[in-house]
Swiss-Prot record:
Positions of the catalytic residues: 84, 175, 177
Recorded name of the encoding gene: trpG
Protein name (record): Anthranilate synthase component 2
Gene Ontology biological process terms, A to Z: L-tryptophan biosynthetic process
Enzyme Commission number(s) of this protein: 4.1.3.27
Domain Glutamine amidotransferase type-1: 3-195
Recorded metabolic or biological pathway in which this protein acts: Amino-acid biosynthesis; L-tryptophan biosynthesis; L-tryptophan from chorismate: step 1/5
Catalytic activity field: chorismate + L-glutamine = anthranilate + pyruvate + L-glutamate + H(+)
Function: Part of a heterotetrameric complex that catalyzes the two-step biosynthesis of anthranilate, an intermediate in the biosynthesis of L-tryptophan. In the first step, the glutamine-binding beta subunit (TrpG) of anthranilate synthase (AS) provides the glutamine amidotransferase activity which generates ammonia as a substrate that, along with chorismate, is used in the second step, catalyzed by the large alpha subunit of AS (TrpE) to produce anthranilate. In the absence of TrpG, TrpE can synthesize anthranilate directly from chorismate and high concentrations of ammonia.
NCBIfam families assigned to the protein according to its UniProt record, in alphabetical order: trpG_papA (TIGR00566)
Subunit structure: Heterotetramer consisting of two non-identical subunits: a beta subunit (TrpG) and a large alpha subunit (TrpE).
Ligand binding (L-glutamine): 54-56, 88, 137-138
Amino acid sequence: MDLTLIIDNYDSFVYNIAQIVGELGSYPIVIRNDEISIKGIERIDPDRIIISPGPGTPEKREDIGVSLDVIKYLGKRTPILGVCLGHQAIGYAFGAKIRRARKVFHGKISNIILVNNSPLSLYYGIAKEFKATRYHSLVVDEVHRPLIVDAISAEDNEIMAIHHEEYPIYGVQFHPESVGTSLGYKILYNFLNRV
C-alpha cells in the first residue's frame, strides 16, 4: 500500500492536504508533530512525507516538533514536501534565514513565477507563472546551497519555492491544497507520482 505521512503542525488545512493525497491514490496518515518520533516514522515506513503548514516559526521546537528532525534524518532517502511552515522548516534546516515578510498574507492570491529553468519533476506540466494562495507572515530568505530557489512571488519577490540540490526535498511557501492555487492539485500529483 502506498503511504503518505503528513506531519501536522497544528494547522486547520492539514485535512485538505490529506483529502487530496487520498484522491490521488495514496493512503494519508496524519500525525501531530509532537506525537511521533523518528523511530515511529521509520516503523511506519512511508513512501513520502508532507510537512504541513501551521502557526509559529521553524526556529522554535515547540512550534514544529519533529519536523526539523524529519528533514535532517529522513530527507536523504524519503521524499519530503514542506508546505508553508514546512517550507520554512526546510529552509531553516539548511541554513536559510527566516524573517518577517514584507507584507502579511492571509488568504491572498499571488502570481508565482518559476525561476529555476532546470526540469524539476515537482513542476512537470506547470506553467512558468500561476496563481497561488498565500497564508503567512514569515518567509525564507538568504537561501544558499544545498538549497535552490525554484519560484518567487511576482509582486514582492519573496521566495515561494525551494528544493535540495541532491535529495528529494521540496518546499512551497504557498498552499497547493487551496482552491485558489490554480495548479496546486497538479503539484501534489507530481509529488506523489513523479518525485
